[in-house]
């Protein structure tokens, strides 16, 4: 905003892509705009935003699954797509995985990517530090995202090394290494501590044992998250 001025549009990546397909960048999907300040409970931006000079840069929010419009005709012809193709508001990547897994009432979902994300269906929003709430098809989904995840694995091992070393691990035997496999300083979930330091030392001579310790550390974070 300081560089481009108040005429800039604040859009999440997926909202920008939807806007490009529509050739209309007015809209934003609610889940992707929580970090911008969108309040799911009241379905509104914070009142204080009204007085800010950049409030017009914010998108018009739509729920996941809402119709945004039809594809731009000239773009449809260029891409050889149907000219009446409907464009629907999507959701976040972790919410998409939750939907794809068809999670039931009492089940939860762990998504291990660059970071570790936990999701669970609830009857109402959960107001706790580090917990985010999303709404999908009139259901509430609460979740938390650790700063730890597969990012720490790729920092030390290649994909081929991970495949080979994993075969040497005995999952029934603990390493007792007590690693905290953060990629950098600071954690947000299951504990909120911006000063928490990674702990991945002392590194064992055995690479398989080291990998096992990192995986145990991730499993411990997941366990604390569910608790």
Each model region followed by its residue ranges:
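Active-site core segments that coordinate phosphate-bearing ligands/cofactors
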Residues: 2-13, 18-24, 35-52, 69, ...
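Helix-loop-beta segment of a Rossmann-like dinucleotide-binding subdomain
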Residues: 27-32
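Domain-core and long-helix interface of multi-subunit machines
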Residues: 63-66
């Amino acid at each position: 905003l300081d560089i481009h001025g108040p005429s800039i549009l604040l859009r999440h990546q997926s909202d920008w892509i939807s806007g490009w397909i529509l050739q209309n960048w007015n809209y934003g999907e609610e889940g992707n705009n929580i970090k911008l300040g969108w309040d799911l409970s009241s379905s509104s931006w914070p009142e204080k935003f009204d007085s800010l000079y950049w409030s017009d840069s914010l998108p018009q929010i739509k729920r996941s699954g809402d119709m945004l419009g039809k594809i731009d005709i000239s773009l449809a012809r260029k891409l050889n797509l149907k000219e009446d193709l409907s464009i629907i508001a999507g959701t976040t990547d972790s919410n998409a995985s939750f939907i794809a897994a068809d999670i039931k009432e009492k089940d939860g979902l762990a998504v291990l990517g660059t970071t570790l994300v936990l999701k669970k269906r609830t009857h109402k929003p959960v107001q706790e530090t580090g917990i985010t709430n999303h709404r999908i098809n009139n259901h509430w989904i609460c979740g938390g995202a650790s700063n730890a995840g597969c990012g720490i694995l790729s920092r030390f091992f290649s994909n081929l090394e991970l495949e080979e070393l994993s075969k040497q691990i005995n999952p029934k035997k603990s390493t007792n290494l007590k690693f905290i496999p953060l990629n950098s300083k600071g954690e947000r979930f299951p504990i909120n501590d911006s000063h928490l330091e990674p702990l991945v030392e002392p590194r064992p001579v055995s690479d398989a044992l080291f990998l096992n310790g990192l995986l145990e550390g991730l499993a411990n974070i997941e366990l604390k998250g569910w608790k």
